[in-house]
């Protein structure tokens, strides 16, 4: 299945440490149209770091599938893209122009590319030139310290991006400033390629409002999907006028355990430790959740953690 913008797209945003293969495979079962890898260093790809190569893997459900890379060194970008070209099942290469983390920004990657638009343009063009994948995309913010979102979006379009995802804050706004949906709408009106809206879209009602207000071609959900991977199904049902039905306790338990099992299959026993943060979010709102979180923080045995998790969610 290719990417079809004839109706709104519902995409999972890349989130470091969360949107790995097991989690992406769970959200696909709830109707996410597009999944994106965690942000991957182009340098690590160029030098074929073993751990990084594993981050490229996808589940059979992930079609279309996007790999997001970070970088600005043109030789390194070329090598990274050529390595991605050798992997089947990847439909999109996405350039990260939004990450505000200091370790990324300090190396002219992520949102710092918004301070050097000629280099950003050159990097998009390099990806487009060397990629054998169907799409090239960009995930951007509204600017670095101040907003110059239309200029950035037009450069993305002119440099060959097939679509963009826009986080409605500047880099300075990080994840706390109010999201400027008006600016996303301005971008949509200013360019001809599809625009996906991103930022604080955590409910079906908010998703519908953002689509109507911005006229965007899709919604990208990040933190709103953590602990609630079924949010994509709720959103599509609500927007299509179908009855919005929250998942049953039994379904949630099934999802949590399936996610846990996939973590172990993908990461080995260490997957149980990684899964603790997911259990923290899955258990929010449950009676006894504080005690449960404290307990799982002290468990690293796979069987013991699974048994305790099953017991907690099926009470």
State what each model feature region is.
Residues 1-10, 43-64, 99, 104-109, ...:
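N-terminal small/glycine-rich loop or linker at the start of catalytic domains
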Residues 2, 15-91:
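Glycine-rich, positively charged N-terminal anion/phosphate-binding segment
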Residues 9-11, 34-36, 64-68, 91-94, ...:
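Structural preference for beta-strand elements that scaffold enzyme active sites
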Residues 15-17, 40-42, 70-72, 98-100, ...:
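Active-site beta-loop-alpha junctions enriched in small/polar residues
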Residues 45-48, 174, 228-234:
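Short, charged, surface-exposed secondary-structure boundary motifs
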Residues 78-109, 118-193, 209, 213:
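Alpha/beta enzyme core
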């Amino acid at each position: 299945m290719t990417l079809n913008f004839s109706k709104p797209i519902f995409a999972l945003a890349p989130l470091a440490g969360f949107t790995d293969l097991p989690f992406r495979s769970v959200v696909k079962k709830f109707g996410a149209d597009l999944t994106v890898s965690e942000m991957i260093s182009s340098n690590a790809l160029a030098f074929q770091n073993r751990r990084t190569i594993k981050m490229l893997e996808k589940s059979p459900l992930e079609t279309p599938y996007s790999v997001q890379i970070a970088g600005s060194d043109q030789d390194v970008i070329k090598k990274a893209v050529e390595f991605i070209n050798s992997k089947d099942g990847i439909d999109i290469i996405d350039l990260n122009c939004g990450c505000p983390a200091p370790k990324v920004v300090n190396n002219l990657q992520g949102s710092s590319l918004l301070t050097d638009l000629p280099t950003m343009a050159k990097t998009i063009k390099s990806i487009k030139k060397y990629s054998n994948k169907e799409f090239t995309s960009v995930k951007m913010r509204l600017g670095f310290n101040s907003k110059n979102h239309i200029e950035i979006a037009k450069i993305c379009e002119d440099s060959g991006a097939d679509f963009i995802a826009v986080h409605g804050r500047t880099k300075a706004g990080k994840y706390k400033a109010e999201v400027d949906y008006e600016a996303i709408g301005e971008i949509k009106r200013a360019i001809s390629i599809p625009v996906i809206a991103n930022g604080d879209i955590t409910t079906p009602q908010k998703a519908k409002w953002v689509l109507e207000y911005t006229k965007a071609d899709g919604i990208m959900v990040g933190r709103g999907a953590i602990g609630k991977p079924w949010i994509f199904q709720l959103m599509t049902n609500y927007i299509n006028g179908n009855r919005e039905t929250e998942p049953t306790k039994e379904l949630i338990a099934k999802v949590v355990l399936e996610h846990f099992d996939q973590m172990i299959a993908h990461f080995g026993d260490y997957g149980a430790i990684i899964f603790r943060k997911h259990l923290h979010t899955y258990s929010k709102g449950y009676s006894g959740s504080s005690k449960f979180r404290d307990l799982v923080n002290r468990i690293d045995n796979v069987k013991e953690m699974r048994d305790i998790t099953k017991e907690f969610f099926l009470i």
